[in-house]
């Protein structure tokens, strides 16, 4: 079993080399745990959530067999952050007007008035 928990934290993505057991993260050499949008800045529907989870799986599969390092986690986290931005810009994801944070961290909402 792994002794050290590696993690990557971006604004909307948190990755851990751990398994979630009950409410605790337990370090693991062979499992990554994804915490998506911990501040609830976006409104997620099943389709957009599935797209991010699918992209996460693609990135993990592409990195399989390589060294699991801080660098690898940062690459995956940064790529997911960019993918979330693409979804937002395409109108497949929107900001949560009831979220505790309203700083439009990925740009202003795309509305007909602003286009």
UniProtKB/Swiss-Prot annotation:
InterPro entries registered for this protein in UniProt: NdhM
Membrane topology: Peripheral membrane protein
Alphabetical keyword list: Membrane, NAD, NADP, Plastoquinone, Quinone, Thylakoid, Translocase, Transport
Localization terms from the record: Cellular thylakoid membrane
Cellular component, GO, one term: plasma membrane-derived thylakoid membrane
Major localization listed first in the record, in broad terms: membrane
One MF annotation (Gene Ontology) recorded for this entry: quinone binding
Catalytic activity: a plastoquinone + NADH + (n+1) H(+)(in) = a plastoquinol + NAD(+) + n H(+)(out); a plastoquinone + NADPH + (n+1) H(+)(in) = a plastoquinol + NADP(+) + n H(+)(out)
Cystines in this chain: none
EC numbers, comma separated: 7.1.1.-
Quaternary structure and interacting proteins, as annotated: NDH-1 can be composed of about 15 different subunits; different subcomplexes with different compositions have been identified which probably have different functions.
Record function comment: NDH-1 shuttles electrons from an unknown electron donor, via FMN and iron-sulfur (Fe-S) centers, to quinones in the respiratory and/or the photosynthetic chain. The immediate electron acceptor for the enzyme in this species is believed to be plastoquinone. Couples the redox reaction to proton translocation, and thus conserves the redox energy in a proton gradient. Cyanobacterial NDH-1 also plays a role in inorganic carbon-concentration.
Protein family per UniProt: Belongs to the complex I NdhM subunit family.
Name of the protein: NAD(P)H-quinone oxidoreductase subunit M
Gene encoding the protein: ndhM
């Amino acid at each position: 079993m792994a002794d050290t928990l590696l993690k990557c934290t971006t604004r909307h993505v948190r990755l851990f080399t751990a398994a979630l057991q009950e409410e605790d993260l337990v370090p693991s050499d062979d499992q990554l745990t994804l915490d998506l949008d911990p501040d609830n800045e976006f409104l997620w529907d099943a389709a957009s959530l599935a797209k991010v989870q699918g992209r996460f799986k693609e990135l993990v599969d592409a990195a399989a067999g390589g060294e699991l390092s801080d660098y690898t986690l940062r690459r995956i986290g940064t790529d997911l952050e960019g993918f979330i931005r693409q979804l937002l810009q395409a109108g497949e994801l929107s900001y949560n007007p009831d979220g505790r944070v309203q700083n439009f961290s990925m740009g202003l909402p795309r509305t007909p008035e602003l286009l």
